[in-house]
Amino acid sequence: MLVGLIGYGAIGKFLAEWLERNGFEIAAILDVRGEHEKMVRGIDEFLQREMDVAVEAASQQAVKDYAEKILKAGIDLIVLSTGAFADRDFLSRVREVCRKTGRRVYIASGAIGGLDAIFSASELIEEIVLTTRKNWRQFGRKGVIFEGSASEAAQKFPKNLNVAATLSIASGKDVKVRLVADEVEENIHEILVRGEFGEMEIRVRNRPMRENPKTSYLAALSVTRILRNLKEGLVV
């Protein structure tokens, strides 16, 4: 399977090494910095390379700049920076391009778990609440930094709350979000879901990547799960 990577930071480098170890072929890596034999500097050159799927591991802006072009080029896309879809107009455009081209956008679960159960129960969900706890030093104070909707959270804290946007897509609801600056060394996500189906509580304590303490290891691993499913016949 031929895979293109967008972004060559901590996650991009991890994925490049993982792909080479697991029988995938890197078609191209798009980034303005860094060095790799498959590196390209622009989207046009990136799209000239033959590939089965592209992986975004860069930024919300990269998703907005490149998603539609990638899909129109006949390439499926895996997205990590899901906060880009807090822009409802952009989300609608991407869905329309998928419908017209027959291509797919795969939403990586990122730094959380339980998305399969949340998506399964989405039609019966009455309330979904995300509480994210981060080290207070990032904000210079302790306490509740933000409380509001997922759409507001993604706009005010675009680098912090891709998780909120992912939950909104999976649940079909505008998730209630609390961002708390706390005495924690690892990012913690607590998800409470209530509805006619029952109740779910999901708690994830993320270990950061050594290369970038602001990036969770689980986020990178969530992309490898999608890639394994695309390659293998048995999908989990």
From Swiss-Prot:
One of its GO terms (molecular function) is oxidoreductase activity, acting on the CH-NH2 group of donors, NAD or NADP as acceptor. It is an enzyme of class 1 (oxidoreductase). NAD(+) binds at A10, I11, D31, A58, S59, Y66, L80, S81, A111, N162, N212, P213, K214, T215. The active site is at H189. It catalyses: L-aspartate + NADP(+) + H2O = oxaloacetate + NH4(+) + NADPH + H(+); L-aspartate + NAD(+) + H2O = oxaloacetate + NH4(+) + NADH + H(+). Pathway: Cofactor biosynthesis; NAD(+) biosynthesis; iminoaspartate from L-aspartate (dehydrogenase route): step 1/1. SUPFAM superfamilies: Glyceraldehyde-3-phosphate dehydrogenase-like, C-terminal domain, NAD(P)-binding Rossmann-fold domains. Optimum temperature is 80 degrees Celsius. Its EC number is 1.4.1.21. Optimum pH is around 11.6. One of its GO terms (biological process) is NAD biosynthetic process. This is L-aspartate dehydrogenase. It comes from Archaeoglobus fulgidus (strain ATCC 49558 / DSM 4304 / JCM 9628 / NBRC 100126 / VC-16). The gene is nadX.
